[in-house]
Swiss-Prot record:
The keyword Aminoacyl-tRNA synthetase does not apply. Its main location: nucleus. Residues 457-501 are annotated as: PEST. This is Developmental and secondary metabolism regulator veA. The keyword Cytoplasm applies. Signal peptide: none annotated. InterPro entries: Velvet, Velvet_dom, Velvet_dom_sf. Residues 314-323, 330-341 have a biased composition (Pro residues). The C-terminal PEST domain is a region rich in proline, glutamic acid, serine and threonine residues that is required for the light-dependent regulation of development and secondary metabolism. Keywords: Cytoplasm, Nucleus, Sporulation, Transcription, Transcription regulation.
Amino acid sequence: MATRAPLAPPPNETEASVSRITREGKKLTYKLNVMQQPERARACGAGAKSSADRRPVDPPPVVELRVYESDPNDDLNKTDITFAYNANFFLYATLETARPMAQGRFAPNPTCPVLTGVPVAGVAYLDRPSQAGYFIFPDLSVRHEGVYRLNFHLYEETKESKDANENAPIQSMSNPMPAKPMAPKSFLEFRLEVVSVPFTVFSAKKFPGLATSTSLSRVIAEQGCRVRIRRDVRMRRRGEKRTDDYDYDEERVYRSSDRFSTPDTHGYAGTPVERPRSTSTSTVDPSFPYGADAQRRSSGATEHGFQGAQPYQRPMPPAPVPAPVAVSTPAPPAPPAPPSHNPGYQSHLSFGSTQTQYPAPQLPPTPQSASTLAAPYSPHPSYSHARNPSTSAEYETPGYSYPSSRVSTERSSYPKNGLPPLRLEPPKPLNMPSGEPRSSDPNAYHSVAQSAGPRSQTPSSSLVPSLPPLKALSGDYPNNLSQPSSSISQSPSHDLGAGKKFLWDTGASLSKRSYEDSFGHDDRPLYNGMRPDTESHPRRLSDAGRNFYNETRDEMAYKRANGRMATKISPALQ
């Protein structure tokens, strides 16, 4: 079977030219050259989504136009008048199949146009790559796959009568109504046609991809024409599968895991080991920096109760012994902390250390005055919580020893008027050994609370204070608990002379500030349709009335977290 010979290309493929004689007897030659041929395209289909996923012909076709003028009898001497010629040019593109198809017996079904996009281009006069007129088609797409050609038709609109054809009738080229534009179709003339080389339109699965923009496209885009420029290769590789399409290679997995995983503390010697996170919320003592072999704090130990074995103990710094004071039992001298230490500067050990024991600090006697009582001092370095410094003597339970009593530091760090005036009764240290059994009678605890008062700066005769164990407080407290003045006056450990006053306000300030004291009459809440100008507001009890009312009624007494007793009016009575 003989093979069919390939079809000969049309005579006007890639290049085409035509000449005509003007009315003045000059010869004009038009020459079209397809400088950039279309190579590939992706079928966009004819459905509803075809316009959303439309791919242009790649690369965009570019057609060059040149106009020459010469004598009709001398074709060798031609002059390029492309820039000087006064006319408008349009190039219209159509699509045709590369191979002609035989016509069927039946009429074909009406179909939508295969070519879509912008098929018309105006001339652009550019200096590069050479001075000529260029037609660019950056937005041409084909709906169906196959092999096609682009057919370009040149149309001219003459502006001067001398440039019309030789046998054309004389018409007025001037517009009788300058304000109204003329219809250009009256002066459009078809000049010539040129076709491109065949190119293939692929389906979406077979499309090889878009190539980088050509140098001609870049040059045209640099001169202001609208051409899409692609700087990277977007060709699809066939045959072999890329190994980096999946995240299963070991290098990538290791690189991604190293950024977020915890470093191995048992790694190689050359690997730096980071300090592990601690469950403590206190600050770190700079005198004991963490090293590579630092132990992690046990996560099971509580911060305010039982504490496990500490990894190290803090030594006591040496300091001069204060002046001796006559006491019943001699106490070993304990140097105070350096002045630079403050209650907020603590080590990372939590409250209630059970492994280290330190004696109480021995302070020199100072005159008892109101200013002396309010002035704080720096106790020895304690292992209390950094955020909640303890302000009272710590409890002692059988089997454990706790640091001795410390003077409250909250009163010096906060203003006195910043908190509601509550009647606070700190427990008084008792002179009893740590191993002495305690009575289970609640009345004994009441007597201890009655004799509690503001501590003086003179040291007590006992080294370690003894307090009753933590127990659930009963609701029936005697009324004499709210009268610390009588109990304090009977206590031998307090010597209040004339002109001296208590550190705690024991007057008529048993509860929070009243609403009237804070906001006044106009800011009180209104109930049951009341108005601000009425006098039917329920008046609250005065301070004296509340004192009498509280003395005849039960008060709400509770023990604060630092160990001091506080009484407060019941919310139902306020």
